[in-house]
Amino acid sequence: MEDLIVAIVVGAFSSAISIFVVRKLDRAKFEVFIEQAKAKAKVIEHEAEMALKDAQLKAKIECDREFKSAKREYEAMLLKIERKERELNEHLESELKAIKLEKEQIVEKNRKITTLKDGLEEQKKTYEEKTLEAIKILENACGLTQSEAKELMLKKVKEDSRAEISSIFRKRYKIAEQNTKNEINNMLSQAVTRYAGEFAAERLINNIPLNDEETKGKIIGKEGRNIKALEMLLGVDIIIDDTPNTITVSSFNLYRRAVATKTIRELLEDGRIQPARIEEIYKKVKSEFDKNIQKEGEDVVMELGIKTMHPELIKLVGRLRYRASYGQNALAHTLEVAHLSGLLASQMGGDAILARRAGLLHDIGKALTHEAPGSHVDLGAEICKRYDECDTVINAIYAHHGHEEPINVESAAVCAADALSAARPGARREVLESFLKRVEEVENISTSKLGVLNAYAINAGREVRVIVKAELVNDDEAVLLATEIAKEIEEKVQYPGEIKVNVIRETRAESYAR
């Protein structure tokens, strides 16, 4: 349509130009040309009208075709929707019919169940009545009530079952006991054979050789002044006249005896033996021993492969070197228990390092028993709790004396190792231990009194020397104190013969000249 209009415009424009040209060229022919142009214009206009009508007709035909196509699609879609709706309605009606039928069936089943339930209740009632009648007949026949008959039957069944269970249990128990014994014996034998420790029984005396008899006179001093100072300061018995060229140092306390022996040896080497020098050497030796105790503990901990331990506990381990139980050195016993505990725990699938730690600390309370009241078990548990030792160590301390049950393999290993070490033939001497306990008890009674500084049992426990503080106890009170201590010893300690209580009160005055 647009092309047609453009053609018409172009033609008209061309005609106008032609007319203009014709006018200019030939006025005479202008009219003819005008007529021709009009004729052409009519032809063109007619053609344009025909083309326009043709285009309109084509457009109408195309619109009708598209409309009919859209109408057909719409009608097809409408039919499809109607069909789906009809199918859904039919399905819904079918479902509703099924639900209605199922509901009717449920109602029918409920009715039948109710009928059966009523019938069962009736039968149950009849059964109970018949049962009661039968029970009454049986009770009349056997002379027992229902409860009595039930008790009799249960008793019989229980007795039969108990006898059978007991028989099975005894058999199984014997087998388990034998197997356990065999396994334990095997473990213990392997652990004992794998550990070869050193052992030496502790003595009560140390002998110091002398070069000549003149040295004895130096030790005794003028009017026995030096030997009295030594015995009072060191807390030991010093015996000079029994053996030629020998000084015997006697004490149940290993630490005091070792310090005394070292002090006397250094005095002999120094040659200057008099009370002031004795006290000076004693302080020096005691300081060295305290340092050695710490090193001894560190060496033991390192030997056992224990990485960390509180310094105070290490110091107490070192002090066990100077403790004895039934003649057995406490540190040697502790080391033996620690090694055996580790071996036993490893064989039982436990932690060998933890077992060795618990074994090392199981008798740690013995390092404190001279200074603090109470059993070594309670003291050891308390000190280990204070320094944050684990529950296994605490349990092992209590368990090895039966105060608690072992809570794990490591604690059980410590208990077994302690029993092995103590029960080994020749490991302990009962007579010596009873003597040591008696002497310790005498010292503890003495030191428990107010104003007492130190107490030393000497002369094989037949005498106790009590050193008191001069500012707290006067001379009259010292006499009363000696009587009180002697009376308490009589009441609490069993001993042969008699024990001499010697209370010593000393006042010192010091001044310096500069």
From Swiss-Prot:
<protein>
    <recommendedName>
        <fullName>Ribonuclease Y</fullName>
        <ecNumber>3.1.-.-</ecNumber>
    </recommendedName>
</protein>
<feature type="domain" description="HD">
    <location>
        <begin position="330"/>
        <end position="423"/>
    </location>
</feature>
<dbReference type="GO" id="GO:0006402">
    <property type="term" value="P:mRNA catabolic process"/>
</dbReference>
<comment type="function">
    <text>Endoribonuclease that initiates mRNA decay.</text>
</comment>
<feature type="transmembrane region" description="Helical">
    <location>
        <begin position="2"/>
        <end position="22"/>
    </location>
</feature>
<feature type="domain" description="KH">
    <location>
        <begin position="204"/>
        <end position="268"/>
    </location>
</feature>
<comment type="similarity">
    <text>Belongs to the RNase Y family.</text>
</comment>
<dbReference type="GO" id="GO:0005886">
    <property type="term" value="C:plasma membrane"/>
</dbReference>
<keyword id="KW-0694">RNA-binding</keyword>
<dbReference type="InterPro" id="IPR006675">
    <property type="entry name" value="HDIG_dom"/>
</dbReference>
<dbReference type="Pfam" id="PF12072">
    <property type="entry name" value="RNase_Y_N"/>
</dbReference>
<keyword id="KW-0812">Transmembrane</keyword>
<dbReference type="InterPro" id="IPR017705">
    <property type="entry name" value="Ribonuclease_Y"/>
</dbReference>
<dbReference type="InterPro" id="IPR022711">
    <property type="entry name" value="RNase_Y_N"/>
</dbReference>
<keyword id="KW-0378">Hydrolase</keyword>
<dbReference type="GO" id="GO:0004521">
    <property type="term" value="F:RNA endonuclease activity"/>
</dbReference>
<keyword id="KW-1003">Cell membrane</keyword>
<dbReference type="InterPro" id="IPR036612">
    <property type="entry name" value="KH_dom_type_1_sf"/>
</dbReference>
<keyword id="KW-1133">Transmembrane helix</keyword>
<keyword id="KW-0472">Membrane</keyword>
<dbReference type="InterPro" id="IPR006674">
    <property type="entry name" value="HD_domain"/>
</dbReference>
<dbReference type="GO" id="GO:0003723">
    <property type="term" value="F:RNA binding"/>
</dbReference>
<keyword id="KW-0255">Endonuclease</keyword>
<dbReference type="InterPro" id="IPR004088">
    <property type="entry name" value="KH_dom_type_1"/>
</dbReference>
<dbReference type="Pfam" id="PF00013">
    <property type="entry name" value="KH_1"/>
</dbReference>
<dbReference type="InterPro" id="IPR003607">
    <property type="entry name" value="HD/PDEase_dom"/>
</dbReference>
<dbReference type="InterPro" id="IPR004087">
    <property type="entry name" value="KH_dom"/>
</dbReference>
<keyword id="KW-0540">Nuclease</keyword>
<dbReference type="Pfam" id="PF01966">
    <property type="entry name" value="HD"/>
</dbReference>
